[in-house]
Amino acid sequence: MVHLWVRAEQRAHEERVGVTPEGVAARVKAGVRVTVEQSSVRAIGIEGYVAAGCEVGVENSWPDAPEDAIVFGLKELPEDGLPLRHRHIMFGHAYKGQPAGRVLLDRLKAGGGTLYDLEYLVGEDGRRVAAFGYWAGYAGAAVALKCWAAQARGGICGPLTRHDGKAALLADLAAEFLGLSRPRAIIIGALGRVGTGAADCLTAMGLAVTKWDMAETASGGPFAEVLGHEIFLNCILARPGCPVFVPASALRADRALTVIGDIACDPTSDFSPIKVYDRATEWDAPALRVAVDPVLDVTAIDNLPSMLPVESSVDYAGQLLPSLLTLGDLGGGVWRRAKLEFDRHVAV
């Protein structure tokens, strides 16, 4: 019998979950054993999962889960260096040259574990079967707007908070923009899920948005147009061959650009298209000031959808559920492709 173990998230400001009570009910009905850990922060309460027929585990007890359990979470595990013996479904951030990713792969190798990276669950056409992209784009645009509004008032963006939904987030932004003009914004990757979410947020706030995608960046750069907007949102994942959108020279350039929202958030990747910063930012300090004359702030947070934890979890879980229903066949379909990706990278 397949045993799915849904762990509590241990990262600060992470309330999302990848399966809803309805999804658990579907797994239980299909004959799967499901354990859901208690969580002090999860946006969806344990009561719904219990009603769906799951077993309840102690918060953060996944290291002691049975050997055959498939441990399912979203964000990174504690960096304690211990070998990992289970099969893990999560966002590993381990295949694009990230230093922390190599550490994760080495821990899995040492313990005999396996990573089924959620970013690499793809169909036969190579497209991801589930993604938080829309919500990352929406929340990322909101944070960039907060950064710009703080600049306009002579400051820097303060700590972020979660919101009960898009309406609450937009109301918060509207209050911050009272008496302010609207900046010009450009999105690269505008046709994808992330870019669509970003554009929806900006449009809802009354901004004129320049939307670029592959056709507009095919020349390889340089891209002076990016520096001609007050806000730039990067919605393109770092990968080999990706052009540089903001070179290091932009720090000293004559530019309108004052806020970069790196929603893709791969600053430690060798292929990052933004060369003016080298580390992610956090909820408590969302803006990194990389230049002062003229000012330039970068915001790059890798769990943006947790600003809207319920909406983003429900949407993502619905996309992922058909694949979770095939966990009994880890040797086929999306799971086989994810395992091949893991095998290729762990062997390096």
Residue ranges and their predicted role:
Residues E119-A171, C265-V348:
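Adenosine-phosphate binding glycine-rich loop
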Residues M1, R85, S181-R184, L257:
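Phosphate-coordination loops involved in phosphoryl transfer and adenosine-cofactor binding
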